[in-house]
Design a protein with these regions (language model features):
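Soluble catalytic domains of enzymes that build or remodel membrane lipids, polysaccharides, and related
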Residues: 1-121
């Protein structure tokens, strides 16, 4: 679940695990001396692991996907869509490139994000 790429520690977590198990795996794979990049479907554990993660990439909410359900997504999820920052930790929640359920979107958009990571100077 963890891959070391030069100075980047890439951690991927299975979505079918409990939050506690996901947190346990993240904490086992953190490398303090490296840039820790976490790929995980649901953004819900970020509050519990953000002090150890430099960048976390998530999705799950599809940014609502279909009106009026996007109104419920805004009420239910703290991290719905966007870039969030806390100290030196960043979370990006994407609206994703595909749908869940009906193959359509209404009132939101799909996206593919490109991140350029560069070393600290």
């Amino acid at each position: 679940n963890s891959k070391f790429l030069d100075d980047i520690n890439l951690i991927g977590i299975d979505d079918n695990l409990s939050n506690d198990k996901q947190i346990e795996i993240v904490n086992k794979n953190i490398k303090k001396e490296n840039f820790n990049l976490l790929l995980i479907h649901k953004p819900s554990i970020w509050l519990k692991i953000r002090n150890n993660i430099d960048l976390m990439l998530s999705g799950h909410t599809h940014n609502g996907q279909i009106f009026p359900f996007n109104l419920f997504v805004r009420l239910q999820f703290k991290f719905k869509y966007n870039l969030y920052n806390y100290n030196n930790s960043n979370l990006y929640v994407s609206s994703g490139s595909g749908p869940w359920g009906p193959k359509m979107r209404l009132g939101t958009f799909n996206e593919v994000i490109l991140f350029n990571l560069s070393p600290k100077e």
